[in-house]
């Protein structure tokens, strides 16, 4: 009986250690190498297949300096205004999210920074639980410890979902505007950024009033967006 209990404890601990060792190895690799495909991309494409949707993956890696500063500022203004200065976590946002989750009785609000969103995109799935949020936090801490801010942002820019099967700034720019990501205007960048929280909803509701309102909010905030110090774009 004691041996069974020991195995029941050791097995999940071993899986946790193995998974985090795998993640850490990939984080080190991604400091210099572009991901072939993220966990979120694989999950999403499998979902489309199960739903009977004929969707092809459009994912085109683009170096950081060849992505418009307008898009960088728009995303920081909308998703994580303190990105350049924090260590991966916005503690004020996390506290607000905890209060909202407690009031609702469910894990809804995440208070996620760009770094946390990237951790989810690279290695996790879309499920919402305190265990998954804990794993996301562990991955975020590892990533922030060994990866420059501009590289984190570069990985994020190239892994964001923007439409059915459309991932990354370059693919989105080509899909929506038929131009490279380097040439995005402020208006175009704001429109793309407004889609980020719910890309598939806005894919189905392209004339949504919420999308227009969000675009205008992003445009107003872009001027004060602070990029990472190493950004020389």
Swiss-Prot record:
SUPFAM superfamilies: Lysozyme-like. Its main location: membrane. The chain crosses the membrane at residues 8-28. One of its GO terms (cellular component) is peptidoglycan-based cell wall. One of its GO terms (biological process) is cell wall organization. InterPro entries: Glyco_trans_51 (IPR001264), Lysozyme-like_dom_sf (IPR023346), PBP_transglycosylase (IPR036950), Pep_trsgly (IPR011812). It catalyses: [GlcNAc-(1->4)-Mur2Ac(oyl-L-Ala-gamma-D-Glu-L-Lys-D-Ala-D-Ala)](n)-di-trans,octa-cis-undecaprenyl diphosphate + beta-D-GlcNAc-(1->4)-Mur2Ac(oyl-L-Ala-gamma-D-Glu-L-Lys-D-Ala-D-Ala)-di-trans,octa-cis-undecaprenyl diphosphate = [GlcNAc-(1->4)-Mur2Ac(oyl-L-Ala-gamma-D-Glu-L-Lys-D-Ala-D-Ala)](n+1)-di-trans,octa-cis-undecaprenyl diphosphate + di-trans,octa-cis-undecaprenyl diphosphate + H(+). Keywords: Cell inner membrane, Cell membrane, Cell shape, Cell wall biogenesis/degradation, Glycosyltransferase, Membrane, Peptidoglycan synthesis, Transferase, Transmembrane, Transmembrane helix. It is a single-pass membrane protein. One of its GO terms (molecular function) is pentosyltransferase activity. It is found in: Cell inner membrane. Its EC number is 2.4.99.28. Pathway: Cell wall biogenesis; peptidoglycan biosynthesis. It comes from the Bacteria. Peptidoglycan polymerase that catalyzes glycan chain elongation from lipid-linked precursors. Belongs to the glycosyltransferase 51 family. This is Biosynthetic peptidoglycan transglycosylase. The lineage of its organism: Bacteria, Pseudomonadati, Pseudomonadota, Betaproteobacteria, Neisseriales. The gene is mtgA.
């Amino acid at each position: 009986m004691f041996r069974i209990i020991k195995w029941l404890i050791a097995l999940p601990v071993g899986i946790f250690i193995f998974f985090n060792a795998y993640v850490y190895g990939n984080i080190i690799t991604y400091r210099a190498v572009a991901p072939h495909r993220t966990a979120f991309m694989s999950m999403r494409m499998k979902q489309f297949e199960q739903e009977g949707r004929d969707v092809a993956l459009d994912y085109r890696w683009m170096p950081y300096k060849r992505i418009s500063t307008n898009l960088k500022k728009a995303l920081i203004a909308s998703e994580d205004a303190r990105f350049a200065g924090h260590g991966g976590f916005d503690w004020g946002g996390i506290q607000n999210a905890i209060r909202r989750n407690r009031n609702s009785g469910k894990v809804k609000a995440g208070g996620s920074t760009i770094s946390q969103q990237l951790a989810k995109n690279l290695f996790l799935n879309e499920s919402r639980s305190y265990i998954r949020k804990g794993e996301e936090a562990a991955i975020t801490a590892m990533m922030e410890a060994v990866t420059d801010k501009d590289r984190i942002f570069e990985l994020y820019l190239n892994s964001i979902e923007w439409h059915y099967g459309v991932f990354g700034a370059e693919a989105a720019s080509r899909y929506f505007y038929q131009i490279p990501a380097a040439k995005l205007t402020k208006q175009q960048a704001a429109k793309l950024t407004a889609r980020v929280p719910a890309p598939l909803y806005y894919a189905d509701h392209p004339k949504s009033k919420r999308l227009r309102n969000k675009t205008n909010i992003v445009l107003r905030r872009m001027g004060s967006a602070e990029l990472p110090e190493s950004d020389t774009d």
